[in-house]
Amino acid sequence: MAKGIREKIRLVSSAGTGHFYTTDKNKRNMPGKFEIKKYDPVVRQHVVYKEAKIK
């Protein structure tokens, strides 16, 4: 079987709270690091989440 082009990633909060979301991304369309603004329930604000590897 062929290997899929979607890779599981972890979005880690830049607020330093330790909160994270998991998602997947298309490696072919988005080869760079992924950044998105999402809600962090620990600080109760929208902050930038940055891509990190799932261990």
Swiss-Prot record:
Instruction: Cite the GO molecular-function annotations of the record.
Output: structural constituent of ribosome
Q: Read off the PANTHER family from this record.
A: 54S RIBOSOMAL PROTEIN L39, MITOCHONDRIAL (PTHR15238), LARGE RIBOSOMAL SUBUNIT PROTEIN BL33M (PTHR15238:SF1)
Keyword Ribonucleoprotein set for record: yes
Q: What is this protein called?
A: Large ribosomal subunit protein bL33
NCBIfam families the UniProt entry points to: PRK00595.1, rpmG_bact
| Annotated family | Belongs to the bacterial ribosomal protein bL33 family.
Q: Does this entry carry the keyword Ribonucleoprotein?
A: yes
Q: Which organism is it from?
A: Vibrio cholerae serotype O1 (strain ATCC 39315 / El Tor Inaba N16961)
Which keywords fit this entry according to its UniProt record?
Ribonucleoprotein, Ribosomal protein
Some GO term, biological process aspect, for this entry: which one?
translation
Classification via PROSITE patterns = RIBOSOMAL_L33 (PS00582)
| Assigned GO CC terms | cytosolic large ribosomal subunit
